[in-house]
Amino acid sequence: RMLPSGGTAATGAASGRETWNRLVEVIRAFFQKKHIWYYVAFIILYRLAEGFVMKIVPLFLKAERSVGGLGLGEQEIGLYYGTYGAAAFVLGSLLAGYYISHRGLSRTLFSLCCVFNLPFLAYTLLAIYQPENGMLIGSAIVLEYFGYGFGFVGLTLFMMQQVAPGKHQMAHYAFASGIMNLGVMLPGSI
């Protein structure tokens, strides 16, 4: 057997009204959790800066140097993101799991948040100095993905351990994941 059974399914709703009542119960239970508004704010703010970076960095990498960009071609960007970035993301995720398992989430969450946001400093330095060295630019992108992998594990575990526990844990985790994505999407609407 490859997949876990997941337990037994709840009985199906008999009517639309019953389904609606269950949904309201799940949402009400979510917002009645102790400290939930702090958790929601934390989740949104954790990824807010990333939302800005996701919109701007591709433009910054492609823009000509004369207008403040780095003037990279599609192949270079693809290599940095698709190959080196993907490997760095996996490595960051694995190391974060190891780090958290040895120290605990409460003792590591602040450092995970710092590592998650460290790449934004690297992009600031790239914008100021506009290096031409591909290794330096690639290193900043690798740092971004490593930090993203490292920090994202912390946020995921935070949602699993602090937000999800309770009667409707799967629904509450899914709801927290949606809130997390809101933190990334809000900057796009600005």
Language model regions located:
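C-terminal ends and interior cores of transmembrane alpha-helices
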Residues: C114-E132
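Short amphipathic helix-loop junctions that connect adjacent transmembrane helices
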Residues: Y46, K55-G78
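Intracellular juxtamembrane helix-capping segments at the cytosolic ends
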Residues: F150-P165
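Helix-to-loop junctions at the C-terminal end of transmembrane segments
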Residues: L91-F110
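Helical-face signature of the major facilitator-like transporter fold
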Residues: I43, R47, I137-G149, L157
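Pair of pore-lining "gating" transmembrane helices in MFS-fold secondary transporters
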Residues: Q32-V53, V142
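Juxtamembrane intracellular "pre-TM" segments in multi-pass secondary transporters
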Residues: G6-V40
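A late C-terminal transmembrane helix in Major Facilitator Superfamily
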Residues: G166-I190
